[in-house]
A protein has these predicted regions:
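Active-site bordering "gate/hinge" segments
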Residues: 1-278
Length: 278
């Protein structure tokens, strides 16, 4: 929720709609408070650990979070309506930065970027917890433009509100973390992050991690923006807005750091340069 709010606020800033820009940040702030209430942090939460989560959630905190979500639900729709029915917003967003479903598949677009171009795919569908225990649906739109990507995030916020309420109402008792032994070998996992599918690939010797690679959604989404969305934009202003609609995390595209047994480090960045660090 907080990620989609800041993504849409950035888009509204790019199309010079200061009012909705500020409203998005206004709606996001209580969500940040809820995150801090649960985890102790607002950005780098450090909540998930191997085998579960770091600590249990107190009932009073869950009640407070439920109320925050309920308050958001009550005032949320009027701001979405401002975007849906605003003629100037439509002028800056509809038929701008278009990407077809075919191009989205070819470029491997993920998350709201792919779903905004007609790809009905969400990694959460593949996880039995989401699929079997929660009432939710995959949000997608077929237009493939800046408007579709922004509305896709708005609609996904609505689904996230539904999921959070169900989690709080049905959270089971028991341990919050399993005691596990990590075997030697290789494993991979995919999850649905706010910007789309994120993949983890790790190799261990049974004690230490020897190799880990993380493929973030911005790698594919920034790529399809340049290849397809920006090809037919009419103005520089539309190009800026289209780039913002992708919700790019440039830092996420930094690729890998390799440590060898001698302690030497090679750092490969997004420009494919290599630095040897002492």
């Amino acid at each position: 929720i907080q990620s989609h709010f800041i993504a849409n606020s950035t888009y509204f800033k790019a199309i010079e709609h200061e009012t909705l820009f500020m409203y998005m940040l206004h709606l996001r702030e209580p969500i940040m408070d809820a995150i801090e209430l649960l985890t102790g942090n607002r950005v780098n939460m450090g909540w998930n650990v191997v085998g579960g989560v770091r600590m249990d959630a107190e009932e009073k905190h869950l009640n407070s979070i439920y109320q925050i979500i309920k308050n958001l639900e009550e005032e949320y729709d009027k701001y979405v309506e401002m975007f849906e029915e605003g003629p100037l917003l439509a002028l800056r967003s509809k038929d701008v930065g278009k990407m077809s479903k075919k191009d989205a598949i070819k470029g491997r677009a993920v998350g709201p970027i792919g779903r905004g171009s007609g790809l009905k795919h969400d990694v959460r569908e593949e996880h039995h917890t989401y699929k079997d225990e929660f009432d939710w649906k995959v949000i997608w739109r077929k237009e493939g433009d800046n408007y579709a990507r922004t509305m896709n995030r708005f609609d996904e916020i609505t689904e996230s509100i539904k999921i959070i309420k169900q989690v709080i109402e049905n959270i089971p008792p028991g341990d919050v973390r399993k005691k596990i032994t990590i075997p030697a070998g290789y494993a991979d996992w995919r999850n649905e992050a706010p910007r789309g599918e994120v993949a983890y690939m790790a190799e261990t010797n049974g004690n230490l991690i020897q190799n880990i690679s993380i493929r973030t959604p911005s790698i594919m989404n920034i790529d399809v923006c340049g290849k397809y969305m920006l090809q037919d934009v009419a103005t520089v202003a539309d190009a800026v807005a289209t780039y913002a609609s992708v919700d790019p995390c440039v830092a996420c595209t930094e690729r890998v750091i390799i440590l060898n047994e001698k302690g030497e480090k090679k750092e490969f960045d997004g420009l494919h340069t290599v630095k040897y660090l002492q």
